[in-house]
Design a protein with these regions (language model features):
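Metallo-beta-lactamase
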Residues: 91-98, 102-183
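Generic beta-strand structural signal
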Residues: 1, 86-87, 108
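C-terminal regulatory/interaction regions
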Residues: 190-220
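Short, small-residue-biased leader/transition segments that mark boundaries at the very start
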Residues: 2-7
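Zn-dependent metallo-beta-lactamase
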Residues: 1, 16, 171-174, 198, ...
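Short, contiguous clusters of charged residues that form electrostatic/catalytic patches at enzyme active sites
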Residues: 9-12, 136
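Metal-dependent nuclease catalytic regions and adjoining charged, substrate-binding loops involved
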Residues: 172, 179-192, 199-201
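Active-site HxH/HxHxD metal-binding segment of metal-dependent hydrolases
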Residues: 11-86, 181-184
Length: 220
């Protein structure tokens, strides 16, 4: 994710084999998660770039506008709910969680879940859905967590710096309570203090709407 010379940072600090080939797995289309792609492509090591089809147009629009890159340059592959991405001997499972963007996904890997911005990093910025339409995907996400193993306390590796420590499944439960409470009207909607917009919170879970309606029911 992110900006700058991503490949150099990965090569120097992450890769155990500095000459390894790379696959890029995108959780969604937003610039702060995709604008490091050209740095990776310049390495000549990228085999494939994975993204959900509902976010593909936004990705390609940004890549073409800022870097002149096409789907062929990115070696683009679509992924959807239920897919498995194989990287060497490792496998990551794809689960759709639309809301932050229409094509937001999370990746299950062993005891970890890479969530991007699908459930926020303490603050969930809802860009393309009200809570009413976000809830089914969030419930699906929780069901997938429980389906795999109720005894595993997954670490949720989120996409932003506000909280550097991993979240647990408890955070996901709090987000579910928050979304359901907003829809029912049990949890009040206020105003965000960091920038213009509307906000609601429950324990460590918060939802922020910069411009979309918060809840279709509550806006009627």
């Amino acid at each position: 994710r992110g900006l700058g010379d991503v490949y150099k940072r990965q090569r120097e600090n992450v890769l155990t084999n500095p000459d390894a080939e790379l696959d890029i797995l995108l959780t969604h289309k937003h610039g702060d998660h995709i604008l490091g792609i050209p740095s990776l492509l310049k390495s000549g090591k990228v085999r494939r770039t994975y993204i959900h089809p509902d976010d593909q147009e936004g990705l390609l629009s940004s890549m073409q506008k800022f870097f002149g890159l096409t789907a062929e340059d990115l070696k683009l592959v679509n992924i959807v709910d239920g897919d498995t991405v194989r990287i060497g001997s490792e496998e990551l499972e794809v689960v759709d969680v639309p809301g932050h963007t229409k094509g937001s996904v999370v990746f299950f890997y062993k005891d970890y879940i890479f969530t991007g911005d699908a459930v926020g990093s303490g603050d969930l910025f809802m860009m393309e859905a009200a809570t009413d339409t976000y809830l089914p995907g969030l419930e699906h996400f929780m069901a997938e967590v429980l389906l795999r193993n109720e005894d595993v306390d997954y670490e949720l590796l989120t996409g932003h710096w506000e909280n550097l420590n991993p979240f647990s499944v408890e955070y996901l439960r709090h987000m579910l309570i928050l979304v359901k409470g907003v829809i029912r009207g049990d949890i009040p909607i206020g105003y965000y203090t960091r920038k213009p917009g509307r906000w609601a919170g429950y324990l460590d879970a918060n939802i922020f709407y910069p411009y979309a309606v918060f809840s279709y029911e509550n806006e009627k």
